Swiss-Prot record:
Binds 1 Mg(2+) ion per subunit. It comes from the Bacteria. It is found in: Cytoplasm. Belongs to the shikimate kinase family. It catalyses: shikimate + ATP = 3-phosphoshikimate + ADP + H(+). Its main location: cytoplasm. The keyword ATP-binding applies. This is Shikimate kinase. GO terms for molecular function: ATP binding; magnesium ion binding; shikimate kinase activity. Pathway: Metabolic intermediate biosynthesis; chorismate biosynthesis; chorismate from D-erythrose 4-phosphate and phosphoenolpyruvate: step 5/7. GO terms for biological process: amino acid biosynthetic process; aromatic amino acid family biosynthetic process; chorismate biosynthetic process. Catalyzes the specific phosphorylation of the 3-hydroxyl group of shikimic acid using ATP as a cosubstrate. GO terms for cellular component: cytosol.
């Protein structure tokens, strides 16, 4: 059985030849809420013709409750435990693109699992970009505070040094989702142990 997923992507080579690429490890998108992990990860997966999975959606499916409901009923420690269990299960599967919740990479055990079985890509965004993207969303339980922007700033300050431990980092600022996905694809191309091409 061949390891990885062999795919054909639409290359922009000058000679017009199609580029074959094989994803050999799961790509794990990490970063703050609002960084674009789900949107960019989904676009990346489409471009590589591999499955896209969202760990938060998988947790909600397993619990038959929303993330906000899990936080309210069972608390954050319970959620983090379930998050680690789901992450371990997804990393054991075939190579794919996996989006994780903003706090998933904070747990050392999760970082170790990702390092051993996949490759982490940090979508890096500043406070203004993140706030613009999340301020009108009511689905972020950690931002249900009297001053959500300040809460977001404090989270960013605490988490950025940990996100910096990711294998790769890509700026998530200006540009379309597709352009950001291309930047991630280019970063992955520097890792032949992750993405193999015939170029």
């Amino acid at each position: 059985m061949k390891v990885g997923a062999e795919v054909r992507r639409r290359g922009n080579r000058e000679d017009g030849r199609q580029v074959m690429a094989r994803l050999k490890k799961t790509v794990v998108m990490v970063g703050m809420m609002g960084a674009g992990k789900t949107a960019v990860g989904s676009a990346l997966a489409r471009g590589l013709n591999v499955p896209f999975l969202d760990s938060d959606e998988e947790i909600e499916r397993a619990a038959n409750r929303t993330i906000a409901e899990i936080f309210a009923r069972d608390g954050e420690p319970f959620f983090r435990e379930k998050e680690s269990q789901v992450l371990a299960r997804l990393l054991r599967g075939s190579p794919c693109v996996l989006s994780t919740g903003g706090g998933a990479f904070m747990a050392e055990g999760n970082r170790r699992m990702i390092r051993e079985q996949g490759v982490s890509v940090w979508l890096k965004a500043d406070l203004d970009v993140l706030w613009h993207r999340v301020r009108h969303k009511a689905t972020r339980p950690l931002l249900r505070t009297p001053n959500p922007r300040e809460t977001l700033r404090a989270l960013l300050e605490a988490r950025d040094p940990v996100y910096a431990q990711a294998d790769l980092a890509v700026e998530s600022g200006e540009g379309t989702v597709e352009q950001m996905a291309v930047r991630v694809r280019e970063a992955l191309a520097t890792r032949p142990d992750v993405l193999e091409t015939d170029e």
